[in-house]
Amino acid sequence: YSGHDIAHVERVTSLALKIAKAEQCQRIDIVEIASLLHDTVDSKLTTSDAATIKLEKFLYSINLDTLTINEIIFIIKHLSYRNGENNQISLSLEGQIVRDADRLDAIGAIGIARAFQFAGHFNEPMWTELPTSSIPSADEITTFEPSAIRHFYDKLLKLKDLMHTETAR
């Protein structure tokens, strides 16, 4: 398990719906569908192009209109942190809500557990032992091999400052 299981999807969807209500979002349908499917085209987990085609076919099969499908796919494709690159992509309120909900599930106790689960899934160590004289500063940690602890510095410790909605903040 990578930490992207059905329990994660359920938490993200529940959080997104709560945020949507508090933010008075009008398109709850987009928030709910994008939340439920938010990891289906994540390049960490699948081949993105093939997954996007399957996702689009599925969304048409449940009789969504083209504009709604395009919005859902845009949100899902630009949701992931991706080394901070997706933070430059402007999302609709619906997209901001789903992104915030996903990020909220990556911090706190659940986020800590998921970070170690993710590292284990990808055969990354908890931490790579270093001589005391070589322990990096937070700015230098990205030069070290991937590990669960490095993931905190690469991403998790930055998320609280990247929330879009007032409710998530």
List PLM regions with ranges.
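Conserved strand-to-helix beginnings and helix N-cap segments that scaffold or border functional pockets
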Residues: 45-49, 109-110
